[in-house]
Amino acid sequence: MNIPLSDRLLACAEFVNPGDRIADIGCDHGYLSIHLLTNGIARSAIASDVAEGPLQSAMHNARKFGVADKMSFYLSDGAKNIPRDFDALVCAGMGADTMIHILEDAPWLRSKQYYLVLQCQSKTPMLRRYLSDTGWHIADERIVKDGKFLYTVMKIRWQPDAPKLTAGQCYISPAMLTRGDPELAEYYQRITDGLRLAVTHQADPEKKAILEELESLEL
């Protein structure tokens, strides 16, 4: 049976280290965990959601695909009510505000015991700024095209001594430049076009400085 995964979620799966235990926050139908288990990537999965409906759907799908014995299910607002015996925490399909709320409510995640895989839907520069300011390091970040939209998936680790991101790096991270995905040029164009539009329609010295920083990059 095929597991219906979007390109976004497939990109998240690629950032999970083989043999690790995962916690999928906001699991929806549970397909990411099921994909990781049926393909022998993860050895166990915690699936959590803030709503009962998606959690019941995830439980049904786990039984359908024969991995219910490797999964546990929790009704939880973010990571509040889940056990802590995992290696990787995955948050996908949420905006920056929600992700920041989840991280603020779980300060115990600030440990080298864990790494996080985040796929942010909106306000990604704000999320990068928050991560940098609170001791998280973006170890890897890739661009993924899903339909007509471009998203990024980042793998982050607790590293309080990591260099802080500049304002421009909150729009295009050093990890993205290092990876050099084929979609980078298009992503860069969309970001700089949006900044130019903002600068044209309103006198915003902060955005103007960010645009100048990004325009100085050699892609």
List where the protein language model places each region.
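Conserved alpha-helix/loop element of class I SAM-dependent methyltransferases that forms part
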Residues: 3-19
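Conserved class I S-adenosyl-L-methionine
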Residues: 19-28
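Glycine-rich SAM-binding Motif I of class I
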Residues: 30, 34
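Conserved SAM-binding motif I beta-strand of class I
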Residues: 44-49
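Conserved SAM/SAH-binding beta-strand->alpha-helix loop
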Residues: 51-53
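S-adenosyl-L-methionine
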Residues: 56-84
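C-terminal substrate-binding/active-site "lid" region of AdoMet-derived donor-dependent transferases
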Residues: 105-155
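An accessory alpha-helical subdomain
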Residues: 160, 164-219
